[in-house]
Amino acid sequence: MLTFWHWKWLGIKNTEFKCVKGKLYLSPIKDLFNNEIIAYDLVRSPNSEQITQMMKQAVARLAGAKPILHSDQGWQYQMIGYQNILRENGI
């Protein structure tokens, strides 16, 4: 059963994987309390839509929780769409 008390701190970091047929980009959100993956998206080319989809998954799963989200300052996290999702959901 999921509980809100451990969703106080979440971490986010894009990771590039080199594969036989090219690169893959993983964008997960991890609960820093128990290392559970809250949401993720995997794409062949990094783009702002990847971050938007991952954040929509996270918001649906958090169901009203308002955690603190740690991320680097990469270009994906500077996009207005990403920042709007955070603002609209009190994250």
UniProtKB/Swiss-Prot annotation:
InterPro entries: Integrase_cat-core (IPR001584), RNaseH-like_sf (IPR012337), RNaseH_sf (IPR036397)
Domain Integrase catalytic: 1-91
GO molecular function annotation: nucleic acid binding
GO biological process terms held by the UniProt record: DNA integration
Cited PROSITE patterns: INTEGRASE
Coiled-coil blocks: none
Listed name of the protein: Uncharacterized protein HI_1280
Species of provenance: Haemophilus influenzae (strain ATCC 51907 / DSM 11121 / KW20 / Rd)
